[in-house]
């Protein structure tokens, strides 16, 4: 809810003290205090973050899991009783803080991850689930003939995305990676509404966060460039734990991460020094946790999948960024390369077709379509990167779907 709406509600309830020019969370806290004092049944929900001391708090996705005075306290006894873990989504009734307490506490737990309490008792832990190659494809083609749809159509042919894909978008600065991410997010939410989409923006500009929130129908979690590295790390850990809990409930989750390079830089600043420093100033232990984040993407045999599509920065002039990219290069099962030369010519999407592709694409695409794609690749291979993408874009602009595209190629 916008801040001005909260202030209007506060005015209706005659709350004036400490509300004007206060943070959004402080206004919510003041409203909850009045409502619970009057004996109203107040319900809260949020994503659990368990702290090292054993207790936890419900964090709000709208606030990008930032700690605030309106967070709900979860006691260690509740965590043990319901076998809760970081990332569980809880909802229930809250009570007013007792003397000496600072936070509202959850008195009655109604649901865990949207299911009754009994249903979440026998869930298999994420680490014990069996990872497989992706076998179900995301259709990114919307068949509406728009210029935005062409991005999805090219990806469907040249770098198909499956449920459980671990994809890396390799991009130099100003090559259109943010626009590409927006178009992929829109295509997934349009064609696959059952998928839980999370867009994770690390070290991004605030105006890009707002634009993403307004264009994408999904969770947008962010930590902007003016936040400390510890905050970037906390946000990333919360997002991956949330995704793991959803997969334990056999859901399909997609995380769009922009960018894994900045996340690795944040871990490099936070991790205690091991004394071993790689080229570019990267600590030897710093890349273990971002690799664990990226490595969580998998198709699960027992049901559910976690897809991570992450951007990696190259040609930034920083040796550290090159080292981070080299470390992640072989870990994904799909790579999409963006080219600065194509972007400078104002040709979008600036995809280097000959360098992009998906491993084991035969598991995602039917054999007759795969043969057509291979013939197209043979045709494009002798061309340079600009000629190849211009050829494909020219043919696609005259057709509304990929089936029609291959029909025109036959002629």
Curated annotation (Swiss-Prot):
Gene Ontology biological process terms in this record: DNA-templated transcription termination
Keyword Iron attached: no
Keywords: ATP-binding, Helicase, Hydrolase, Nucleotide-binding, RNA-binding, Transcription, Transcription regulation, Transcription termination
PROSITE patterns on file: RHO_RNA_BD (PS51856)
Gene3D superfamilies: 1.10.720.10, Nucleic acid-binding proteins, P-loop containing nucleotide triphosphate hydrolases
InterPro entries assigned to the protein according to its UniProt record, in alphabetical order: AAA+_ATPase, ATPase_F1/V1/A1_a/bsu_nucl-bd, CSD, NA-bd_OB-fold, P-loop_NTPase, Rho-like_N, Rho_factor_ATP-bd, Rho_RNA-bd
Entry GO terms, CC: cytosol
Domain Rho RNA-BD: 41-116
Its EC number(s): 3.6.4.-
Protein function: Facilitates transcription termination by a mechanism that involves Rho binding to the nascent RNA, activation of Rho's RNA-dependent ATPase activity, and release of the mRNA from the DNA template.
PANTHER family: TRANSCRIPTION TERMINATION FACTOR RHO (PTHR46425:SF1)
Annotated family: Belongs to the Rho family.
Protein name: Transcription termination factor Rho
Provenance organism: Xylella fastidiosa (strain 9a5c)
């Amino acid at each position: 809810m916008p801040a001005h709406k909260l202030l209007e509600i506060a005015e209706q309830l005659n709350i004036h003290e400490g509300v004007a020019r206060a943070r959004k969370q402080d206004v919510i806290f003041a409203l909850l205090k009045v409502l619970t004092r009057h004996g109203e049944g107040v319900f809260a929900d949020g994503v659990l973050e368990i702290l090292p001391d054993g207790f936890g708090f419900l964090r709000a996705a709208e606030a990008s899991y930032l700690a605030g005075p309106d967070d709900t306290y979860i006691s260690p006894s509740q965590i043990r009783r319901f076998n809760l873990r970081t990332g569980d989504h809880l909802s229930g009734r809250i009570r007013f803080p007792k003397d000496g307490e600072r936070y509202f506490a959850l008195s009655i737990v109604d649901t865990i991850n949207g299911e009754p309490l009994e249903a979440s008792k026998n869930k298999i832990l994420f680490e014990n689930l069996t990872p497989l190659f992706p076998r179900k494809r995301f259709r990114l083609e919307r068949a509406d003939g728009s210029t935005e749809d062409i991005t999805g159509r090219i990806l469907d042919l040249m770098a198909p995305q499956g449920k459980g894909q671990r994809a890396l978008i390799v991009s130099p600065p100003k090559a259109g990676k943010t626009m590409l991410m927006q178009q992929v997010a829109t295509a997934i939410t349009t064609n696959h509404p059952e998928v839980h989409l999370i867009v994770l923006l690390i070290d991004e500009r605030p105006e890009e966060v707002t634009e993403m929130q307004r264009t994408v129908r999904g969770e947008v979690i962010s930590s902007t460039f003016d936040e400390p590295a510890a905050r970037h790390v906390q946000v990333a850990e919360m997002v991956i734990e949330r995704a793991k809990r959803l997969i334990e409930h056999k859901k399909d989750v997609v995380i769009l991460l922009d960018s894994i390079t900045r996340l690795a830089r944040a871990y490099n600043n936070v991790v205690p020094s091991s004394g071993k420093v790689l080229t570019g100033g990267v600590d030897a232990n710093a890349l273990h946790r971002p690799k664990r984040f990226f490595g969580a993407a998998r198709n699960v045999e027992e049901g559910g999948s976690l897809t991570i599509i992450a951007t990696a920065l190259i040609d930034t002039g920083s040796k550290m960024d090159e080292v981070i990219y080299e470390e992640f290069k072989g870990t994904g099962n799909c790579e999409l390369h963006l080219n600065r030369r194509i972007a400078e010519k104002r040709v979008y999407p600036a995809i280097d077709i000959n360098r992009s592709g998906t491993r084991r694409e035969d598991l995602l695409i039917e054999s007759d379509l795969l043969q057509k794609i291979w013939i197209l690749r043979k045709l494009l291979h002798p061309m340079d990167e600009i000629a190849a993408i211009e050829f494909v874009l020219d043919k696609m602009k005259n057709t509304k779907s990929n089936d029609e595209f291959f029909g025109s190629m036959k002629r």
